[in-house]
Curated annotation (Swiss-Prot):
GO CC term, one of those recorded: MKS complex
Extracellular side: 20-629
Signal sequence range: 1-19
GO biological process: one example: sperm axoneme assembly
Native species: Drosophila melanogaster
Gene symbol of the encoding locus: tctn
Transmembrane segments: 630-650
Function: Probable component of the tectonic-like complex (also named MKS complex), a complex localized at the transition zone of primary cilia. Has a role in ciliary structure and function.
UniProtKB keywords: Cell projection, Cilium biogenesis/degradation, Cytoplasm, Cytoskeleton, Glycoprotein, Membrane, Signal, Transmembrane, Transmembrane helix
Family statement drawn from the similarity comment of this UniProt entry: Belongs to the tectonic family.
Membrane topology: Single-pass type I membrane protein
SUBUNIT field: Probable component of the tectonic-like complex (also named MKS complex), composed of B9d1, B9d2, Cc2d2a, Mks1 and tctn.
Name of the protein this chain belongs to: Tectonic
Compartment(s) where it occurs, according to its Swiss-Prot or TrEMBL record: Membrane; Cytoplasm, Cytoskeleton, Cilium basal body; Cytoplasm, Cytoskeleton, Microtubule organizing center, Centrosome, Centriole
Annotated knockout phenotype: Simultaneous knockout of B9d2 and tctn is viable and does not show sensory behavioral defects. Males produce motile sperm and show only slightly reduced fertility. Sperm flagella show weak ultrastructural defects including broken and disorganised structure. Length of the transition zone is decreased and recruitment of the tectonic-like complex compromised.
């Protein structure tokens, strides 16, 4: 039995918090009977699952490859391709939902194998100015300023030319003992220079002397819809006056002294500093007078149309308790509350504005009158089916800084033959958070908090380390109390902060899957592996409660206070090379920290436990590249040493001669 290490006393300085002893858990012998004053309570459950449960989602066996390799000669010469017998391809990293029955457990959607659009970042939703997006209707091409089809360099442009751009010549030019031999590349084709260069698509300086069309021709739309970036128009039905929708803006100053027009499909976020509450109230009244007297045109006005129909802006007030109260037309200018946040929400179908709503959020005034007041303006463009879309983190692979996508296995009914991931479920009643939300520290304190918001989710490629405290009520130290229930509840509350969302025990992690791609596909999900470093073949021992009647103390054994997430990243070329350098996840792992023993006494009213959580992203090629670079450097050093010794030897021969 290992020697018991001394307990580490962590003093948590709070007004109700007292000292708590945290020690390292050890393997206790269950056959040794405790003393008369000590009571050990076994958990009510049957214990942690065996290693068979974790290994049920395992890697598929790789395909057997039989290859005949000819003799290697230097310099290499053109040889016939060896005959390769390859079995049916399988995925050893991105696993199906059940490795034992692949064909019967996968739910395959439509064939999108050869579809790739570099600007299509959201599945089931049309992306702005992305004309190759399958989710965009044909009418949007008349509205968008189309982005290029691919923002990444093509594979052809990444072939390096060893003839002129490197120090080593090719063997075609200088066939020596040190040259580059490229036998598998196609012969370079020299094209005659094109003398007729079209520069119409390039950016140019604007010619101020060029003839400009009249205001009538510019204001008259060609197709009866807004273009991307076109100014939204207001209409006064009584005076038949046309105006533009403008909001206060600031330039090189926190005070908003300018006006900025609202452009179609372009969100706006402005923050303006106010002198006092009177100026704040005056700004709100000015905006409400504009929205009550004017209507927003759903499309630019056509001078040939006799009647103009505008959209009435609906004004709603958000209270401090997130309550919503919409005001009637005519009474929306009489507000006695102080507002510090204005949000204009425009619902559209890309070509026209369908509905307009103005949300006013009540301000929380500070006790200090000298604290400055700020007024925030937000303009959001929302599509009709935006809430029904699934989250994505890239056109195919992950974008750097995009949220890591998670999902879980749905419970399988007896009538269903296929087991589905909740991300691909068509049931709209299932509301699930598809990101890995990690706890953070409160701004004013060290307590842990967790918000189900994509802004707080783990970002791809960004390592993270968070330390915070969990505050929990002290146990009731009585001889006949259920101490095991308290210790298990304490560990469950810790797991609710350290594990993915809706996971209160380690068994729930086996149902969590991580998307292999930034644009999830039904058969490209990775299981979240649970790794216990003390014994990689078994799960950790269950939580135990030991009550010492003589000392009036309770010990919760085998408590975990820290975890670490590990993700292995690879860069692959997909879609037959048309989507190069895609960042994908190859492996996801949850590594458990060290087990601890927590000891509580009667002097404690509230306990504060230190928690730690980390997330690391590893490139799978980094280790191989670093080792290869070391070998290459060593080889170069040996070569340089041989050349150096050869020069010395030749020099000595010359001296002797």
């Amino acid at each position: 039995m290992k020697e018991v290490l001394p307990l580490v006393v962590l003093c948590l300085a709070t007004y109700h918090t007292h000292s708590i002893k945290i020690g390292i858990s050890h393997n206790y012998n269950a056959t040794i009977s405790p003393t008369a004053s000590t009571t050990t309570e076994a958990p009510a459950t049957t214990g942690a699952p065996s290693s068979e449960t974790v290994s049920s989602i395992s890697t598929l066996p790789e395909a057997e490859v039989t290859t005949t390799t000819p003799a290697i000669t230097f310099p290499p010469r053109v040889q016939q391709k060896p005959k390769v017998a390859v079995a049916s391809p399988t995925m050893s990293t991105a696993l199906p939902l059940n490795s034992t029955e692949v064909n019967s457990t996968l739910s395959v959607s439509g064939d999108n194998t050869f579809y790739y659009c570099s600007c299509d970042l959201q599945a089931g939703r049309c992306d702005l100015n992305c004309c190759c997006d399958n989710d965009c209707p044909l009418e949007t091409r008349q509205v968008f300023n189309c982005l290029p089809n691919s923002l990444l360099p093509q594979l052809e442009s990444r072939l390096e030319d060893f003839q002129y751009t490197h120090g080593l010549p090719t063997c075609q030019i200088n066939d020596g003992w040190l040259c580059v031999f490229r036998s598998n590349t196609k012969a370079t084709k020299t094209q005659p220079p094109d003398m007729n260069i079209d520069t119409s698509q390039y950016r140019k300086w604007k010619d101020n002397l060029e003839y400009q069309e009249s205001d009538y021709a510019q204001s008259r739309p060609s197709a009866g819809h807004y273009k991307f970036g076109q100014t939204l128009q207001l209409w006064q039905p009584e005076t038949k006056q046309l105006a533009t929708l403008e909001l206060p803006a600031a330039y090189e100053s926190p005070n908003c002294q300018l006006k900025q027009s609202v452009w179609h499909l372009q969100p706006i976020r402005h923050v303006c500093r106010m002198k006092d509450s009177a100026q704040l109230q005056e700004s709100i009244w000015s905006l409400l007078n504009q929205t009550s007297n004017y209507e927003i045109l759903s499309k630019p006005r056509d001078l040939e149309e006799p009647e103009v129909n505008g959209l009435i802006v609906q004004v709603c007030l958000r209270g401090a308790n997130k309550s919503m109260r919409c005001l009637e037309r005519g009474n929306d200018t009489q507000l006695d509350v102080i507002v510090d946040h204005v949000e204009l929400q425009l619902i559209h179908n890309f070509t026209n504005i369908l509905e307009a709503k103005l949300f006013l959020e009540e301000a929380k005034l500070a006790e200090d009158d000298n604290e400055p007041l700020w007024l925030r303006y937000n303009v959001e463009f929302v599509t009709l089916n935006e809430s029904l879309t699934k989250p994505t983190s890239g056109p195919l692979g992950y974008l750097s800084g995009a949220p890591v996508i998670l999902s879980r296995m749905l419970p399988q009914n007896s009538s269903e033959d296929k087991q589905l991931i909740s991300y691909h479920s068509l049931n709209q009643n299932i509301k699930e958070f598809h990101w890995l939300s990690l706890p953070s520290r409160k701004p004013r304190g060290s307590s842990c908090q967790r918000a189900l918001d994509h802004k707080e989710a783990l970002r791809f490629g960004i390592d993270l380390l968070t330390r915070c405290e969990l505050r929990h009520a002290a146990p009731l130290l009585q001889a006949h109390a259920n101490h095991t229930e308290y210790c298990q509840g304490l560990q469950a509350q810790i797991w609710s902060l350290l594990l993915p969302h809706n996971c209160t025990q380690l068994e729930d992690v086996t149902k969590v899957f991580v998307s292999h791609l930034g644009r999830p596909q039904p058969d490209k999900w990775l299981p979240m592996e649970v790794r216990y470093p003390e014994n990689v073949h078994e799960m950790p021992p269950p939580v135990q409660a030991v009550y010492d009647e003589m000392r009036q103390s309770l010990s919760c054994r085998n408590i975990f206070l820290s975890v670490g997430y590990e993700f292995h990243v690879a860069h692959l070329a997909m879609v037959e090379g048309r989507a190069p350098h895609q960042r994908v996840l190859q492996h996801a792992r949850l590594v458990l920290g060290q087990r601890h023993d927590l000891e509580f006494d009667t002097s404690e009213i509230e306990v504060a436990l230190p928690l730690s959580i980390s997330a690391m992203f590893y490139r799978m090629q980094t280790k191989a590249l670093s080792n290869g670079a070391a070998v290459g450097i060593a080889g170069h050093l040996v070569l340089v040493e041989m050349i150096y010794l050869g020069i010395i030897y030749l020099g000595s021969m010359q001296l002797c001669l």
